[in-house]
Amino acid sequence: MLKAVLKKSREGVKGSKKEAGGDFGSETPTLSSSGDSPVNSLSTTEDTYRVSLAKGVSMSLPSSPLLPRQSHLTQSRANKKSPGPVRKPKYVESPRVPGDPVMIPFREGSKPAEPIETEAKVDNEPSCSPAAQELLTRLGFLLGEGIPSATHITIEDKNEAMCTALSQGISPCSTLTSSTASPSTDSPCSTLNSCVSKTAANKSPCETISSPSSTLESKDSGIIATITSSSENDDRSGSSLEWNRDGSLRLGVQKGVLHDRRLDNCSPVAEEETTGSAESVLPKAESSAGDGPVPYSQSSGSLIMPRPNSVAATSSTKLEDLSYLDGQRNAPLRTSIRLPWHSTAGARFAPYKPQEILLKPLLFEVPSITTDSVFVGRDWLFQQIEENLRNTELAENRGAVVVGNVGFGKTAIISKLVALSCHGSRMRQVASSSPSSSLKTSDPTHDLPGTPLLSPSSSTSALSAARTPPGPGTVDSQRPREDAVKYLASRVVAYHYCQADNTYTCLVPEFVHSIATLLCRSHQLAAYRDLLIREPQLQSMLNLRSCVQDPVAAFKRGILEPLTNLRNEQKIPEEEYIILIDGLNEAEFHKPDHGDTLSSFITKIIPKFPPWLKLIVTVRADFQEIISTLPFVKLSLDDFPGNQDIHSDLHAYVQHRVHSSQDILSNISLNGKADAALIGKVSSRLVLRNLGSYLYLKLTLDLFQRGHLVIKSASYKVVPVSLSELYLLQCNMKFMTQSAFDRALPILNVALASLHPMTDEQIFQAINAGHIQGEQGWEDFQQKMEALSCFLIKKRDKTRMFCHPSFREWLVWRADGESTAFLCEPRNGHALLAFMFSRQESKLNRQQTVELGHHILKAHIFKGLSKKTGVSSSHPQALWIGYSTEGLSAALASLRNLYTPNVKVSRLLILGGANVNYRTEVLNNAPILCVQSHLGHEEVVTLLLEFGACLDGMSENGMNALCYAAAAGHMKLVCLLTKKGARVDHLDKKGQCALVHSALRGHSDILQYLLNCEWSAGPPQPGTLRKSQALQQALTAAASMGHSAVVQSLLGMAEEHEIEVNGTDTLWGETALTAAAGRGKLEICELLLERGAAVSRANRRGVPPLFCAARQGHWQVVQLLLDRGCDVNPNDKQGRTPLMVAACEGHLSTVEFLLSKGAALSSLDKEGLSALSWACLKGHRAVVQYLVEEGAEIDQTDKNGRTPLDLAAFYGDAETVLYLVEKGAVIEHVDHSGMRPLDRAIGCRNTAVVVTLLRKGAKLGNAAWAMATFKPDILIILLQKLMEEGNVMYKKGKMKEAAQRYQYALRKFPREGPGEDMRPFNELRVSLYLNLSRCRRKTNDFGLAEEFASKALELKPKSYEAFYARARAKRNSRQFLAALADLQEAVKLCPTNQEIKRLLARVEEECKQLQRNQQQKQQAPLPAPPNDSDNDEEAPASSLKDHFPIEEAEEEDTSSQEESISPTPRSQPPPSVPSPYIRNLQEGLQSKGRPASPQSWAGISKSLRETVAQPGLVMQPTKQAQIVKTNQHLGSGQSSMRNSNTKVQVSSQNPPPSPMPGRVSAAPAVSRNQHLEGTGPFSTGTGCGHFGDRLGPSQSLQLQRGESGTAYPLPSKVKAAERLLAHASVAVDMALPSQGGPVSCSDVRHPASLSSSGSSGSPSSSVKMSSSTSSLTSSSSVSDGFKAQGPDCRIRDRGTTQVQGGTAEHRPRNTPFMGIMDKIARFQQQVNPPSRSWHCPVTEGLLTNTATAAGLQTNSEKPALKPGGYCSQAKPCSVPPLGMGVHNGAQVKELEENKCQVPALCQDNRKTKGVPHLYPEGVSKQPLHVSTEAHRSHLTSAKPKRSFIESNV
């Protein structure tokens, strides 16, 4: 038969092993879909599915409940390999990577989830130090996306790097790296604390195993850690309460796709950082240096029911197959399209901080409980539970046990509490008859036998109810009963159902994992969820790997300890919480050979529960002994006759069912009407028969309701009397003949034998696996399944479970005297399942192999073969499994089979050919024998030794099985192994033998036994050692670990075995006393001193016990040693004292104690370092503070000239540095190498210290800037410091100094290189530009102010601050339209800023007023009164939310004078002949322009139309004026030469500095692009000024009359322009002071500059001037080196040059220009408008950089000259009309002549340092003629101006 069963095409199998798609069910994940999904929604390949099912297509039983399950059989594509992180494990012969399954339709109501990247997201936040973050926050500086994290070195990293020597047993000396004072790495003094600080140190041998390999990682595990949340997190973890009886989903649950994550590199016993990415290739093994897993007890109670399944190790929860896991991740329609291996390699290794809880709960569905069930009564039970749990005096108040027989409603009680709890959304609330309950639906055809769960009681949310339990004095006695269930439900935080149908629900690891998941999902424990997200190591501690390895440690460290800590921190409400567990007896069905069942696990863990965490469990009455030791109160449901409450509950249930069903009422009454007496009689009869069973009542009433039972008499003889009779009746109704049952029997057998629920397809394949010929058809099978649908309930994941555990038991076992009809044979089911695995085409994975072995053993089909043939049945069984799979060795070494082994299956695997020396994936790839020896599984060790396991097999750290057994304390295994010949003197790679391992853990009995064993005589061979050496090592090890019993035992045999109390061992080089002192083992030290240990005996490195104790901070040991005669001030080899050592390590208590004992505070070591120096070097602030208070010298220098402040700055603790500075440490101290503390901090990238020192006044020298090179974070801090200094000067009104600091900061910006992120610097640069713009605006240099604002906009186009700043500069320079455009942009970007809105309103009004004035002037051409538009208040910069706010409140004018635009039109004189000076004027105006908002273009052309006749223009400039011109030309020429511009540019733009007129030769095309760079700090590429705004009305009119409407000037107009321009030089001297400094219209952003507004064909002279009163050298001392910006080609629009129409806008000067505070000047302006003299436009046009060279020193200094000035020496002249530009065609025509006049206009105010700011208000505005009176009136109106403080917007 075996031959026939196994007969298959081997060549086909082998050929397809590497190509097949995947194991069905395990490697092809399930799609959970509702029962009401249409059948026709299946894909068209369904027939192929059926055919392949019959032919043995790859398939397996469902895998772990934490993995998705498959609903339809799918054929995978071949050769679909994963190119990603999944690698082929070396342990499996050739594991497949599953293919992509065929897409399966969604269930109805579900939506495809959005693809979610499975790669870990990298945090983009900058990882700079907290101090740097603090600084940035304080300054309000936004770093954007921050500096690349690679540029930051945290203090912790530096600590680790700097203290590497310390961790290696090396003390820091002057080089901060080397010394030999502390123990070596291998010394127990230095490293064993990692081995003993754990709780279970005496139980694990792993404490000295320091390999990076994990003890728990499985390189190809399938339940890896957190097989995280897939869409089934919510879908599969609910209950059947969400479903109707017909299987349809009541409320469509939308699937959410989450990623499958793995965080499995951390075990519960070894703390280690998790790997970065969820898809990290092979899981890192972790060091087992910690507590090893607690050995499992092997005790097992004798149970009433025999243990039918020892399947803990055969659980299909797969921990081994990565390929299986990835197959699950390829689940159709459930996972992201971008699968794990689609992520980029870069992201794969990025650090990952999980934002989700990567844990997944089990799926619990209770088939007998559905939404149409009702729950009646049990209020008394809930009340008793509540009273007992809240009774603090009761010893059994840790929980409650509800005991009851089969069908008594235990599961219904638990489900009621779950439904009303915070998890009610996952497990739908039980339906009830109350109006608030969910709508009930019922389908009689699908009514199933099951427990009654139903409840007419209110089902409102338990969270809102019962927050406060009812008081004891409540009058209404019923209310406490009703509130009890709500109170209990409101405290439920987790639940668990044990179901024999599903192995996973009965296993301890899954229990721990699922409980943890539900705890973090409960509303009450939100803090626990947050903690798991913050600390991924906790999630790793709770993953399935960790739970399999040591569930006790996982539960304790992953659940109980975090919850206790959160409770202590008051992050969890001060309430009691409850965990529900149903059916503990069910878990006994799957008791493992080794390890705990759930009941024994709870018994172990319950003492560790906090008193506020309770358990409510249920158990059958005949299994009470499994919970006999639990401190729980016991509540019984079996006390039926004696408990009236139980009786009332049963009656209430019957009454409810009868009244709610007309069918039942019609059945029991003759007339179909409700007769109370009859109903009461029926109720009483049923209650008496059921003996308290709700299940009996439910099934019986269901029969009544469907009409299967009809009561014809009062005897009720037709009513069954027991559950057995009810099941028999139901089966008889389903199967009318025996043959009908026989056809369905195989299905029941398979369902009984399976370890977990199976889908219809899996059952179908198992049935056909038993057929050699004539396979069953799918339609026939479907009919059988339909017949069994009332017994095998289909769950949400399409798997099937028995309707009730009692029915499952009834099918396999009957009591004496009961009918044996319908008995099933599970053995046949096991055989069918084994055949199914055998006929599977693809290779079985580890879990499937173990499961196959389980089914082969359970089937036992070769029973009796030995009697017939003499061959043991185990041989054919071994052949069977050997032929069926190739991965026997891998299955034997699977993780679950190691920790909870199935001995019988393991034997079968070994018989089949598994390698007993196979290396596992735990304990540093130890062989199986080593792992089992470590775990103490004696039976498995014996089995392995029986089959020849190698005794000398070692793990990667060199430990053999004897070392592991000795370290773990397994005495029996040590004896067994030594008797089998294990070598006692074997050394691992650390040089430790089994004797030392036992001494380290304190196992004195094993140590004594090993001493009595035979040791090798003679000289030790390599890898061995003598017994005396081992004993000396054991003494040191025991002393360091504090095992006094072992130390005493060893000292007692000192004479016999040559043990010296002062001896130094050969392993660590320690004496017993130095080891104990370094560990702080005071008791051992006292014992050793009593036994004669020398107090001053040093170890091999020369470190005495006193230094060992002082270094580790054990002051009690120090006191003991000093009391025994030690000197308090000894010196070691480096000259250090114990005080220095203690200070270096930061042990304040030890430092205090040593000083109290007279330790010298001023002692210096050989490097000149004191105790304070060492404390500063290591950053121990508390010690530093104490030493300084005790009088330590704060400026003590070492041999290298370093002070404690230098060392503290080197370490990087900002608070220590701050303390030292506040205590008087010299902040500018320079050591022998020329370094200061600030330089050291910068060099070490200690940003917090840099910030602290800068705050305290540290100066920035060249060394600091040099050290900051390539350190962007530090450089930003230094630049911010410069900007802060500038801000301070700005607030003090020192504009020049502030601008210098800003310029200096700009020069220090790094050059942009490849790979550098300049965004943070750009933000800072923007702030500097804005601050410079404010400075220039305050010094009246509006052109540069505008330019800097434009530069800020270049870097940050969306900066509303920059738009605002530029708008203010434009407004001040009378460019209202351009300012309006910028303000409108600013309002768009920041619509809530009130200051911008206020200024916008003003500018709009000014524009309107300007237009009105122009119209009035055209109607009545009279000069308008001056307009003072510069007294508007400017809001503080803080209102604009500048990055680095400068208090511009100081710019506010306290004057209440508002902008007043005179409404009266100015009388305009009649037009005159075009002036002959216009051509010279026009030549001067041809300079580079600046792009601006287009609105400003029209403003220029409009204002150009204004002409105002100004009298008194002299024909030649004065001598002094020519001198000024010469100076300016020299300055401009030097500037251009120094900036390496071409000589052509110099000659064309800067004519010879001669007082005689000269022509400017400038080509029309070239002159536009030529520019010079100024010498001043703000000399950027600037063109001519915006003087079009200043044009007088009369001049504009004259120009209009002279123009021909074309862009080319007529020859007749040329001379007039020449004559006008020739004498414009005087206006230079007059216009500058009249403005309080020239309005620099040199902003490259604005087309209002005249060179751009001129016709493109006209020549232009881009002359750049510097009108600074300071010298060139002083003005260039802080030059920023800005590159001059060339003209913008966008400004060639000629349309703006045509000045046509009479509606052109003009800009009258109705008020004095900004800064005029003199009342006389204002009065003259107001009362004498005709005498107003507009300053020459040539000054604005040609003095392109006027007032740009040195921040307008002229304006920032108070004038000293009298009103005469040099202007008083000038000849009277008529000032040309302001604003006359080359827009006018008439002017353009005259450009070819009199170019020699240009130099006359290019004057510098260099000699006007003391010149008052003259306001030529008295100059008569009359037709152009020379007038002495006009000259006099001009001079009288000129008033000195006070230093300008910007008070106007």
From Swiss-Prot:
It comes from the Eukaryota. ANK repeats lie at residues 886-918, 924-953, 957-986, 990-1019, 1030-1059, 1068-1097, 1101-1130, 1134-1163, 1167-1196, 1200-1229, 1233-1262. Its main location: other. This is Protein TANC1. Disulfide bonds: none annotated. Belongs to the TANC family. InterPro entries: Ankyrin_rpt, Ankyrin_rpt-contain_sf, Dendritic_Spine_Reg/Scaffold, TPR-like_helical_dom_sf, TPR_rpt. SMART domains: ANK (SM00248), TPR (SM00028). TPR repeats lie at residues 1279-1312, 1326-1359, 1361-1393. Expressed in heart, lung, liver and kidney. Expressed in brain (at protein level). Keywords: Acetylation, ANK repeat, Phosphoprotein, Repeat, Synapse, TPR repeat. Residues 8-21 have a biased composition (Basic and acidic residues). One of its GO terms (cellular component) is axon terminus. Pfam families: Ank (PF00023), Ank_2 (PF12796), Ank_4 (PF13637). The gene is Tanc1. The modification N-acetylmethionine is found at residue 1. Phosphorylated; by MINK1 and TNIK upon stimulation by RAP2A. May be a scaffold component in the postsynaptic density. The modification Phosphoserine is found at residues 60, 63-64, 204, 267, 455, 1429, 1456, 1658, 1666-1667.
